[in-house]
Amino acid sequence: METALPAAGFLYWVGASTVAYLALRISCWFFTALRVWGLGHEAGVGPWLGEWAVVTGGTDGIGKSYAEELAKRGMKIVLISRSQDKLDQVSSEISEKFKVETKTIAVDFTSEDIYDKIKASLAGLNIGVLVNNVGMSYEYPEYFLDVPDLDNTIKKLITVNALSVCKMTRLVLPGMVERSKGAILNISSASGMYPVPLLTIYSATKAFVDFFSQCLHEEYKSKGVIVQSVLPYYVATKLAKIKRPTWDKPSPETFVKSAMKTIGVQSRTNGYPIHSLVASVSASLPSWLYFKIAMYSGNSIRVRYLKKMKMN
């Protein structure tokens, strides 16, 4: 009985400390949510930063919604994507709805020889906002060596998800620094916050975008340039293969309206209150438990996908 008492006391303090830690994290989340989404206001995003906003991957999903939100604020829009037909359609929709000028640049971001064309097309434009949104992922979660067409997949994911962010920033940032104002919004992913097995290459490229953004923000915030890393969880987009939005998987429009409120308030954001809460909870998990959950979740999706493909 005497030896049990110290052990009971130790367990009590371990439990109390754990509860206190979780309570502190939840309190911090509520404070942050209130500051950002309750009281916050984006840092003057509009034509005063520069007439034009450039959006890569701007014909679908999150990219299209950013283009629409920026056009709503009176900015002229440059859409950069692969399909000229889709570019023409979205460009026409935006110009008619928001009465702003639009330009389109049709390029395939899986190629590395596109940036001279983009540079020439952007020459002379007063660019206030760059949204680096273009991206690609796996067809389904898979073990690294079993990823279909692995060598080509490695090259494509790095070229589209990581190289494009560096190259586009290289083209646009000098003008922002010269004018001492501008905003670069880099769309990373929650998969870049924590390693995601079975999406290894994708997760690694998104971690690159997150680190690149954080470093760049520290380098250039004194020059008047905001660089933001946006780290969403699931959004109902074609890339995520989610057809209908839910309370935790918002539509692109809902997500972007929420994320716009974080510009100038958070340099690193999940963009959406529920996503921020999930990130806070995930950060409190021990790594062994996180990886167990991540592997189980990814492998479940993998098995269902392969079973469906076999049936077809």
From Swiss-Prot:
Motif extent (Di-lysine motif): 308-312
EC number(s) on file: 1.1.1.330, 1.1.1.62
Active site per the UniProt annotation: Y202
Top-level taxon in the UniProt lineage: Eukaryota
Keywords: Endoplasmic reticulum, Lipid biosynthesis, Lipid metabolism, Membrane, NADP, Oxidoreductase, Steroid biosynthesis, Transmembrane, Transmembrane helix
A GO MF term: oxidoreductase activity
PANTHER family in the record: RH59310P, VERY-LONG-CHAIN 3-OXOACYL-COA REDUCTASE
Function of the protein: Catalyzes the second of the four reactions of the long-chain fatty acids elongation cycle. This endoplasmic reticulum-bound enzymatic process, allows the addition of two carbons to the chain of long- and very long-chain fatty acids/VLCFAs per cycle. This enzyme has a 3-ketoacyl-CoA reductase activity, reducing 3-ketoacyl-CoA to 3-hydroxyacyl-CoA, within each cycle of fatty acid elongation. Thereby, it may participate in the production of VLCFAs of different chain lengths that are involved in multiple biological processes as precursors of membrane lipids and lipid mediators.
Protein name (database record): Very-long-chain 3-oxoacyl-CoA reductase
Source organism per UniProt: Bos taurus
Lineage: Eukaryota, Metazoa, Chordata, Craniata, Vertebrata
